[in-house]
Amino acid sequence: MKKSSLLYKIINGIWDMCYIWKTEMRNVFRDEGVLIFCILVPLGYPLLYSWIYNNEVVREVDTAIVDLSHSHSSREFIRDYDASPDAKATYYCNSLDEAKELVRRQAVHGFLYFPADFDTKLNRGEQAHVGVYCDMSLMLTYKAIYQTSQAVASHINSSIQITQAGGFTDRDDEITTEPLAFDEVPIFNTTGGYGNAILPAVLVLILQQTMLLGIGMAAGTSRELNRNRELIPVSEHYGGIFRIVFGKALVYFMVYAVMGMYLTLVVPKLFSFVSMVTWTTILGFLLPYILSCVFFGLMLSCLVRYRENVMLLVVFTSVPLLFMTGVSWPLSNIPGFWQGFSWVFPSTFGIRGFLRISSMGASLSDILPEFRALWIQTGVYFLATCLVFRQQLRSARLKANLAAEVAEEEDEAEEIVDS
């Protein structure tokens, strides 16, 4: 077969791509750092995070009480609060400073504050206030204290309304306290828990972040082992852009295709989270999401000079990226600039699409905007990766030629000296 023929070039390109794939795959499993980020973290971290929030709610949350009123009304509020299943009045303090110290020592997760004029204002028919102070480092305890306080306050408000209305029958009292009756029926997040609300988004974000960390660390290792500190080595197998890009991309796509199915199908089932995922939908959805993450990571790998750099570039972005998806913060309250900035990252559309698939049973046609956006990102980042690798390949060849010329000059100089 002639070397100039098209068939020979195609076969040679496929052979080189397989060689690059084999080399990159071997490096992934030999490099401890890359192995941790690409294999161990996606396997273990979701289990730990899901286990923490598996209970969905917490019970008997320790709470301090600062009662400066010492009245019948404040004691009634505290008694009802302590009788609830979610919270418990553990400490009674004489000042705010004493309660703050308990929160600082993690003895309690919050405290209730009753001012001295609490009962006086109620008896005058004025609006009274109860201060609710919560430690927001754990959302489950914050939710338990805050919602229990609201429920008790609503119950006491109803009692005051009944007293002031002067109704004659129980039906009159019902109409006074609840003129419009309604039943709250959760449709998607049936447990109303934190895990079902946030965990699907976190699982999808883990895919992107661990992939970026693994690709970045592998790129840093390649530069450190390269004599010219270049991302792409000078070799006969690394002679074309497409074979390099496809060879490297195939490695991470194969690894994260398995991890993606594990995170989206296995983990929710293990912890009994709401999951309405179907095989066909999730396979069609993960294909553009994983590809866009792979090409996005390969494009950014040119910025990594040392292995440690990737930690600075990726790790701190996890929480902001989760906020910008509109999952833990209302999308309507996010400025337009940051909404546009979030479109750069595949996780934005990946999280929004997967939440609809997992919690609402959506099909690919129901998430068409996110599905199209992921394919657009795949195409854009693929072209950007090819351009970046082309520049890196040129730079590597240029430095290799310069190094060869310098070596020849040194050899000639040594021969002159010896003669």
Task: Give names to the regions the model predicted.
Residues 37-38, 200, 246-247, 310-313, ...:
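Hydrophobic core positions of alpha-helical segments in small-molecule transporters
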